[in-house]
Design a protein with these regions (language model features):
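Class I S-adenosyl-L-methionine
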Residues: 1-104, 111-112, 204, 220, ...
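A contiguous loop/helix-start segment that scaffolds small-molecule binding in enzyme catalytic cores
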Residues: 2-8, 73-76, 85, 89-94, ...
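Short, well-ordered beta-strand core segments
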Residues: 32-33, 120, 156
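Short gly/pro/ser/thr-enriched loop/turn and capping motifs at secondary-structure boundaries
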Residues: 40-42, 108-112, 129-131, 165, ...
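Short, hinge-like loop/turn segments at secondary-structure boundaries
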Residues: 51-53, 119-124, 175, 199-202
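A short acidic, often aromatic-flanked loop/helix-cap motif at beta-alpha or helix-coil junctions
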Residues: 58-64, 109-110, 138-140, 190-192
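Short, structured loop/turn "capping" segments at alpha-beta junctions
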Residues: 103, 121-128, 178-182
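Short, glycine-/small-residue-rich phosphate/pyrophosphate-handling segment
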Residues: 114-141
Length: 256
C-alpha cells in the first residue's frame, strides 16, 4: 500500500486567488478533504467531484479515523483558514500524522486584513510593535490578561475571539484610550466579508447589536473574525521616513 500524503493546506482568508500554486496542486491531487463550510463555496471549482466534510462536526478520534480510512485510497487534505503558523487548531493532527504530513504555507488572516485596509501594522512614530494573540490563548489559566499586551505604540491583532464586544472593550480600555481606533473584520475575502471601523468608545454602538464573534452561536463552525486595535489603523507614514532610510541605510551602501 502506498504511503499517501496528508496535506495541511494553508488557504489564506478564503479567496482562492490567495492560495499558493502548491496548495492548489495539493487540492487537485487529494481524493478527500476536510474544510470549513465557508470554503466549500469559495473553492467549489477545485472541490468538484471530491469528498468534502467539515472537521468541526467531529471529535479528535473521529477525524483521525476519517483520515486514516481515506489515506488507504489516496492523498487527503485539510484546508486550513489563514496560515498554519498562527492560531491554527490543527497542530495535533500534524503531530499525529507527522511522517505523512505535508504542511503548505499560505497568507495569514492578519496579512490579508492589512491588504484590505491598506495599512501596515508598524508605522514609524505611531506603532513600533505588532502583537498577535488570542483571548482564548492568554486567559485560560487567568495568570495573564489581554490588557497586558496592549498600549500606546502597540498594534494588537486578535484571533479566535470568545468575548462579547462589551467585555472586550472593557478589557482593552485598561491599555488604550477610548479614542483608540479598532477594526473588526469578518470573513475576510470570503462570502459575507464585512469591516466595521470605529474607536473603543463607539465600536459597540457601530455593531448595533450584532455578534461578530459568534459568542451565542449554536453552530459548530468557527467564526472567521479578526480584531485589530491601535493607531496604525488611521495613521500613514510620512514621506520623510523614506528619505531618512535612503540617507542612512541605502545611499551609504551605494557609495561603498
Amino acid at each position: 500500500m502506498a504511503d499517501h500524503p496528508l496535506y495541511f493546506i494553508s488557504c489564506g482568508p478564503g479567496d482562492p486567488d490567495l492560495i499558493t500554486v502548491g496548495g492548489l496542486r495539493a487540492i487537485e491531487q487529494s481524493i478527500a478533504l476536510l474544510a470549513p463550510k465557508v470554503y466549500e463555496e469559495g473553492f467549489s471549482a477545485y472541490l468538484s467531484g471530491k469528498e468534502v466534510e467539515s472537521p468541526f462536526t467531529m471529535d479528535h478520534q473521529t477525524v483521525v479515523d476519517w483520515v486514516d480510512s481515506r489515506l488507504k485510497r489516496g492523498p487527503v487534505a485539510f484546508l486550513l483558514p489563514g496560515d498554519f503558523s498562527t492560531f491554527s487548531p490543527f497542530h495535533s493532527f500534524v503531530e499525529h500524522f507527522f511522517d505523512r504530513a505535508v504542511v503548505i504555507p499560505g497568507v495569514s488572516a492578519h496579512a490579508a486584513a492589512a491588504a484590505l485596509l491598506k495599512r501596515s501594522w508598524d508605522i514609524a512614530g505611531v506603532a513600533h510593535t505588532a502583537i498577535i494573540t488570542s483571548p482564548r490563548a492568554i486567559t485560560r489559566d487567568g495568570r495573564v490578561s489581554l490588557r497586558e499586551y496592549g498600549g500606546e505604540g502597540n498594534t494588537l491583532i486578535l484571533y479566535m475571539l470568545n468575548l462579547p464586544i462589551g467585555e472586550l472593550v472593557t478589557e482593552l480600555l485598561h491599555a488604550y484610550t477610548p479614542e483608540t481606533p479598532i477594526a473588526i473584520l469578518e470573513n475576510i475575502a470570503c462570502p459575507g466579508e464585512r469591516v466595521t471601523l470605529g474607536t473603543l468608545d463607539d465600536i459597540e454602538a457601530r455593531l448595533d447589536g450584532r455578534d461578530p464573534f459568534g459568542v451565542g452561536s449554536t453552530s459548530s463552525e468557527p467564526t472567521l473574525a479578526l480584531v485589530v486595535v491601535g493607531g496604525a489603523l488611521v495613521s500613514g507614514e510620512k514621506p520623510d521616513m523614506w528619505d531618512y532610510r535612503y540617507e542612512k541605510l541605502w545611499k551609504p551602501r551605494e557609495m561603498k
